[in-house]
C-alpha cells in the first residue's frame, strides 16, 4: 500500500499522541509521538492497525 511508503510526519502541533508508523527501511511498525495535526496516512492509532494494513 502506498501509505506504508510515506515518511513519518510528526506535524506542527504539540499534542504528543503515541502513534505507530510503518518504517519501510526496517519493515516494522514503529512507535512515534504525533503532534495531533498535519501528518499523512502512515499514522496508526495501534500497532495492530499498522501491522494489518502494512503487513509488518
UniProtKB/Swiss-Prot annotation:
A GO term from the CC aspect: extracellular space
MF annotations from Gene Ontology: potassium channel regulator activity; serine-type endopeptidase inhibitor activity; toxin activity
Subcellular location: Secreted; Nematocyst
PROSITE patterns listed in its UniProt record: BPTI_KUNITZ_1 (PS00280), BPTI_KUNITZ_2 (PS50279)
Keyword Secreted assigned: yes
Post-translational modification: Contains 3 disulfide bonds.
Keywords, ordered alphabetically: Disulfide bond, Ion channel impairing toxin, Nematocyst, Potassium channel impairing toxin, Protease inhibitor, Secreted, Serine protease inhibitor, Toxin, Voltage-gated potassium channel impairing toxin
Cysteine pairings via disulfide bonds: 4-54, 13-37, 29-50
Site (Reactive bond for trypsin): 14-15
InterPro entries linked: Kunitz_BPTI, Kunitz_BPTI_sf, Prtase_inh_Kunz-CS, TFPI/VKTCI-like
Domain BPTI/Kunitz inhibitor: 4-54
Function: Dual-function toxin that inhibits both serine proteases and voltage-gated potassium channels. Has potent activity on both trypsin (Ki=50 nM) and chymotrypsin (Kd=1.6 nM). Shows inhibitory activity against 5 of the 7 potassium channels tested (rKv1.1/KCNA1; IC(50)=12.6, hKv1.2/KCNA2; IC(50)=181.7, hKv1.3/KCNA3; IC(50)=29.7, rKv1.6/KCNA6; IC(50)=43.9, drosophila Shaker; IC(50)=114.9). Has an anti-inflammatory effect in LPS-activated macrophages in vitro, specifically reducing release of TNF and IL6 but not nitric oxide and reducing expression of IL1B precursor.
Note from the entry: Negative results: does not bind to and, hence, probably does not inhibit serine proteases plasmin, kallikrein and thrombin. Has no activity on Kv1.4/KCNA4 and Kv1.5/KCNA5.
Family the entry assigns: Belongs to the venom Kunitz-type family. Sea anemone type 2 potassium channel toxin subfamily.
Name the UniProt record assigns to this protein: PI-stichotoxin-Hcr2g
Originating organism: Radianthus crispa
